[in-house]
């Protein structure tokens, strides 16, 4: 149970700051649990990611990020969906703030779609104070 709670915390990139609805939290929790199981990440890896530790280059962690971002519609086949990101985060954080972070992060490209997702997650995490 603690593992699922940890996942729900890391999944929406500062969910508390964004004040997600109960429904949004439930969806994030379910998607996170599914992706964690699918990719086989450990509790320690989830905690590290939640705490902003992006030193883990384990492909499982990177593919977890990809799985989650695809489930919520932010990525499709490694490509950022800027309209979806703005539609989902804009009402929570303000469109101008989200657009500013998008300008910094959305051109991120990694070696493959999992690496791209991980780098994108890291960029959004590091710029979360702006959204």
Curated annotation (Swiss-Prot):
Origin superkingdom: Eukaryota
Keyword Transport: yes
Positions of disulphide bridges: 35-67, 63-114, 105-123
Signal peptide: 1-15
This protein's UniProt keywords: Disulfide bond, Olfaction, Secreted, Sensory transduction, Signal, Transport
Keyword Secreted assigned: yes
A biological process from GO: response to pheromone
Record's GO cellular component terms: extracellular region; extracellular space
Tissue: Exclusively or primarily restricted to the olfactory system. Expressed in all olfactory sensilla including antenna, maxillary palp, proboscis, other adult chemosensory and larval chemosensory organ. Also expressed in the wing and tarsal gustatory sensilla and dorsal organ. Expressed in larval hemolymph.
GO molecular function, one term: odorant binding
Compartments where found: Secreted
Function, as annotated: Present in the aqueous fluid surrounding olfactory sensory dendrites and are thought to aid in the capture and transport of hydrophobic odorants into and through this fluid.
Name used for this protein in its record: General odorant-binding protein 56d
Organism: Drosophila melanogaster (Fruit fly)
Originating gene: Obp56d
